[in-house]
Amino acid sequence: MGEKRNRNGKDANSQNRKKFKVSSGFLDPGTSGIYATCSRRHERQAAQELQLLFEEKFQELYGDIKEGEDESENDEKKDLSIEDQIKKELQELKGEETGKDLSSGETKKKDPLAFIDLNCECVTFCKTRKPIVPEEFVLSIMKDLADPKNMVKRTRYVQKLTPITYSCNAKMEQLIKLANLVIGPHFHDPSNVKKNYKFAVEVTRRNFNTIERMDIINQVVKLVNKEGSEFNHTVDLKNYDKLILVECFKSNIGMCVVDGDYKTKYRKYNVQQLYESKFRKDEDKSVKQ
């Protein structure tokens, strides 16, 4: 039997499918979000799987965005200088034309989760906005997926997730500013850093040839151990406490910092490998019994 159709000749699930939107384009400087690798030719299906997973996690962590929207915006404005606030308000005014609903004249709220088609094989990207902190958001998801009590396989096409806290243009001077912004709280802030860490830098480049991989690594290592720092962090490629992830795509560089359990416990945030490992352990346990 064929699928049920309504009076207009459309199938019953057409409205649900319309809710899923993928924008096309490049990643702007300052973008926060989550890269996801997936099976070849299944980029859209992977994005749909992630949309369900991400929206559930968003509701769990943050609830209805309307409740905290004004508060987060006020906090953001407090952190800005007067000059920056004026610039921000001008940018918001300029963006009202594209953000207005023509039928009602009301400005649409920006979605905290927005998928972007990068036109790159086996990769999709989800742009995030406040209150989402990408690295914390992804870690919470990985904890759920790694839970041995949770044996439901939520995804089929998704492979690896990589959060980026912020991003910048593919220029060395911009990379330096980005690195100082991202790594500072993890390596230089005495209120957060309690010891000398072993760390490593992992660089992934896709359609990117602007800056050499080793130049990126050497620069980031130099900034971690900057002159005048009260800490003496050391490079350890295998047994690191912290890993600095650098994602380079076309003209954009994204960066974040994750803990050592990224590799030891969460399979480098590879969802597929995490599932396989969990199911294998469950099978071995059943055989022994």
UniProtKB/Swiss-Prot annotation:
GO terms for biological process: tRNA modification. The modification Phosphoserine is found at S72. Residues 1-10 have a biased composition (Basic and acidic residues). Its main location: cytoplasm. It is found in: Cytoplasm; Nucleus. Residues 146-259 form the THUMP domain. GO terms for cellular component: cytoplasm; nucleus. Its EC number is 2.3.-.-. Residues 1-31, 64-83 are annotated as: Disordered. Probable tRNA acetyltransferase required for the formation of the modified nucleoside N(4)-acetylcytidine in serine and leucine tRNAs. Binds RNA. This is tRNA acetyltransferase TAN1. It comes from Saccharomyces cerevisiae (strain ATCC 204508 / S288c) (Baker's yeast).
